[in-house]
UniProtKB/Swiss-Prot annotation:
Compartments it resides in: Cytoplasm
Record note on quaternary structure: Homodimer.
Organism: Polynucleobacter necessarius subsp. necessarius (strain STIR1)
Binding site for (6S)-5,6,7,8-tetrahydrofolate: 121, 125-127
GO cellular component, as recorded: cytosol
Function, in words: Catalyzes the reversible interconversion of serine and glycine with tetrahydrofolate (THF) serving as the one-carbon carrier. This reaction serves as the major source of one-carbon groups required for the biosynthesis of purines, thymidylate, methionine, and other important biomolecules. Also exhibits THF-independent aldolase activity toward beta-hydroxyamino acids, producing glycine and aldehydes, via a retro-aldol mechanism.
The protein's enzyme class: transferase
Name the record gives this protein: Serine hydroxymethyltransferase
Family membership noted in the UniProt record: Belongs to the SHMT family.
């Protein structure tokens, strides 16, 4: 019998200490990793609930195990809420992550060796869209499209390649692309060449839900996403689809790819979808975009180049070559100043993937803690101050003190 008073601090002091240290890091550092955010206490409460105890292979009303009547309620809430949020005909909320969601689409519609198209990883795509080391690149025949001379998606190249190769699947979406994507144009192309059109909106989902970024659902056969990042939910995946594809996708997720769903995570997804439907979430996402633009403009004014010239979303790539600095070096020195970001390749990057010539910055997390344009500009100046003089410990210490002053004014969790 378990004692509810037997806290984690008592049960496992070592782990508790690590968690508390991570909590302090999150409070004290400015988080600029574009794929990270802070979830609400309600999301965390659902994820830490007794639903973690229940096996529930199958779908609501059609389970392999008994005792799922309340589990069905939780999953159906998640399904109904995410469909309403994005205007989708059908949804699967069971994928454990975005990569699993993408793999399920491949399993549902492709056979090994089939041809598909996705955005080049080197120019802003995602590893699950055809990287040679990923399952998508090993088992299938990926054809990559990229960027034009303005560092925006080269739709003419995409159209030419699609007409030449006749892919069975066309993927839109990116992990490091700051501009809006023309989903309508790509959807028309997919119909023309007889391809399934899939959009991976993992990075943009929160913005889409709030109406500040184009919604791919009306134009795509399938839309996959994570539920964290800009959507601000737990770490997990979802698949939205036309009703005609529901059976194929559901069968691909279970039993094709996964066994038992993570019901505690699905419950947390349901909470996040409810939060995303509230009026305040739209205001939050508008601020996410405003903060990203303010950050980008500040960095440009301080002499840094932003890939594609700026941002229409929450994310941007900073080209560091003018500073004679690698992304790896910038990530490290900014971390010393308590500014967290990630190294990232830029288009036609001459450096290795674990070194890179750029960093990726995103505004969702700093916006969650209450930053507005003024604070975003401050952050931009902090970054520029560090990168202007990265080898001076006194300079790093000065910026770190300024970061501490700012983060104390805007706690993540009161």
């Amino acid at each position: 019998m378990f004692d509810r008073q037997n806290t984690l601090a008592k049960t496992d002091p070592q782990l508790w200490e690590a968690i508390q240290n991570e909590n302090k890091r999150q409070e004290d550092h400015i988080e600029l990793i574009a794929s990270e955010n802070y979830t609400s206490p309600a999301v965390m409460a659902a994820q830490g609930s007794q639903l973690t105890n229940k096996y529930a292979e199958g779908y609501p009303g059609k389970r392999y195990y008994g005792g799922c009547e309340f589990i069905d309620v939780a999953e159906q809430l998640a399904i109904d809420r995410v469909k309403a949020l994005f205007g989708a005909e059908a949804a699967n909320v069971q994928p454990h992550c975005g990569a699993s969601a993408n793999q399920a689409v491949f399993l549902a519609f492709l056979k090994p060796g089939d041809t598909f198209m996705g955005m080049s990883l080197a120019e802003g795509g995602h590893l699950t869209h055809g990287m040679a080391l990923n399952m998508s690149g090993k088992w299938f025949n990926p054809i990559a499209y990229g960027l034009d001379k303005n560092e925006e998606i080269d739709y003419e190249q995409m159209e030419r390649l699609a007409r030449e190769h006749k892919p069975k699947l066309i993927i839109a979406g990116a992990s490091a692309y700051s501009k809006k994507i023309d989903f309508e144009r790509i959807g028309k192309l997919a119909k023309e060449v007889g391809a399934i059109f899939m959009v991976d909106m993992a990075h943009y989902a929160g913005l889409v839900a709030a109406g500040v970024y184009p919604n791919p659902v009306p134009h795509a056969d399938i839309v996959t996403s994570t539920t964290h990042k800009s959507l601000r939910g737990p770490r997990g995946g979802i698949i939205l689809m036309k009703a005609e594809h529901e059976k194929a996708i559901n069968f691909a997720v279970f039993p094709g790819l996964q066994g038992g769903p993570l019901m505690h995570v699905i419950a947390a997804k349901a909470v996040a979808f409810k939060e995303a439907a509230e009026p305040g979430f739209k205001d939050y996402q508008k601020q996410v975009v405003a903060n990203a633009k303010a950050l980008a403009e500040t960095l440009i004014a301080r002499g840094l180049r932003i890939v594609s010239g700026g941002t229409d979303s929450h994310v941007m790539l900073v080209d560091l070559r003018a500073k004679s600095m690698t992304g790896k070096e910038a990530e490290r020195v900014l971390g010393e100043a308590h500014i967290t970001c990630n190294k990232n390749g830029i288009p036609n990057d001459p450096e290795k993937p674990m070194v890179t010539s750029g960093i990726r910055l995103g505004s969702p997390a700093m916006t969650t803690r209450g930053f507005k344009e003024a604070e975003a500009r401050q952050v931009g100046n902090f970054i520029a101050d560090v990168l202007d003089n990265p080898n001076d410990p006194a300079n790093i210490a000065k910026v770190r003190a300024q970061v501490a002053e700012l983060t104390k004014r805007f706690p993540v969790y009161d």
